[in-house]
From Swiss-Prot:
Gene: GNAT7
A matching Pfam family: Acetyltransf_1
Keyword Protein transport recorded: no
Organism in which the protein naturally occurs: Arabidopsis thaliana
Protein name according to UniProt: GCN5-related N-acetyltransferase 7, chloroplastic
Quaternary structure and interacting proteins, as annotated: Oligomer.
Source taxonomy: Eukaryota, Viridiplantae, Streptophyta, Embryophyta, Tracheophyta
Role according to the record: Protein acetyltransferase with dual specificity triggering both N-alpha-acetylation (NTA), with a large spectrum of modified N-termini, including methionine, alanine, serine, threonine and to a lower extent valine and proline as substrates, and epsilon-lysine acetylation (KA).
Localisation per UniProt entry: Plastid, Chloroplast
Binding positions for acetyl-CoA per the UniProt entry: V189, C190, V191, R197, N198, G199, V200, G201, Y202, N228, E229, A230, Y235
Length: 274
């Protein structure tokens, strides 16, 4: 399936498996300072054969280096934008988009983006040695070094601790003082098309739950377009349930498919409940 590439702005959650972009086309907005967050929903993709991957070599972790952030930005550009390979200066355009996403990602994860308490870029990576020559394009675009070996970012999402995401439906939980620190949203969820059907989306969401719990988050949200059945299935199987739907007039005004807001209650840690 084509992964949602969730919006942070890349849609909140819509990006995990590549739904069309947030405006209803097959692309999705980059999450950059001047643009809204992007989400790409998961879309089924039956024509892609899942490669044989040693799943024990997956590492799901928060990005800790600029090299890894750059690789994640390149994966998002590759996932959220349908670019004609034969177009003039296509490589220059891809790099331009990646640079914008990279700078926006650095701004968010460093705590400099107004309105966000904290943002983590969570990536799924594989050793370069695990990927065959048939993955040359992916490896070339999304490779980085962790200081020990070369690895490739094959999935990514943002965990955003904030009240709401720009131009998106806001969650209602928790209420009261907790809204300032205990609510989070997933966005820019994406998985390389070559690695679909390897459980990467579930691994990313599971990791985001653990990180959110460490932050004291009690309520996690994600957005998904109403017709993205694959994305909804992914989130529902991960424990999310529908809280509300975007008003049709708002979707028309923003010139995009109508979205659903999904909610997940996270267990309260013993320390938090004392």
């Amino acid at each position: 399936m084509a992964f949602l590439c969730s919006s942070l702005p890349s849609s909140s959650s819509i990006a995990i498996f590549g739904d069309p972009n947030t405006d209803g086309s097959s692309r999705s907005y980059l999450s950059i300072p001047s643009l809204k967050l992007r989400f790409r929903p998961v879309a089924a993709s039956s024509h892609i054969c899942a490669p044989a991957i040693d799943k024990s070599t997956f590492v799901i972790s928060e990005s800790v280096s600029e090299d890894e952030l750059w690789a994640a930005a390149c994966l998002r550009v590759r996932t959220f934008n349908e670019l004609n390979p034969s177009a003039y200066n296509i490589q220059d355009h891809r790099r331009y988009l990646a640079e914008r996403e990279f700078e926006a990602l650095k701004e968010r994860t460093s705590g400099k983006r107004e309105g966000f308490t904290r943002v983590a870029c969570i990536n799924a990576t594989l050793p370069l040695s695990q990927l065959s020559s048939s993955f040359e394009d992916l490896c070339s675009a999304c490779k980085f070094s962790d200081g020990i070996e070369d690895r490739v970012v094959v999935g990514s999402l943002d965990l955003n601790q904030c009240r709401w995401l720009p131009d998106e439906i806001a969650g209602t939980k928790p209420e009261g003082i907790g809204v300032d620190f205990a609510r989070a949203y997933l966005s820019n969820v994406c998985v390389a098309k070559e690695l679909h059907r390897n459980g990467v989306g579930y691994k990313l969401i599971d990791k985001s739950k653990r990180v959110a719990g460490e932050w004291g988050i009690t309520d996690m949200y994600v957005h998904v377009t109403v017709d993205n059945e694959a994305a909804k299935s992914l989130y529902m199987k991960s424990g999310f349930e529908q809280e509300t739907a975007e008003p049709a007039w708002q979707a028309r005004y923003l010139n995009r498919p109508q979205r659903l807001l999904l909610w997940l209650a996270l267990p309260t840690s013993p320390i938090m409940s004392m």
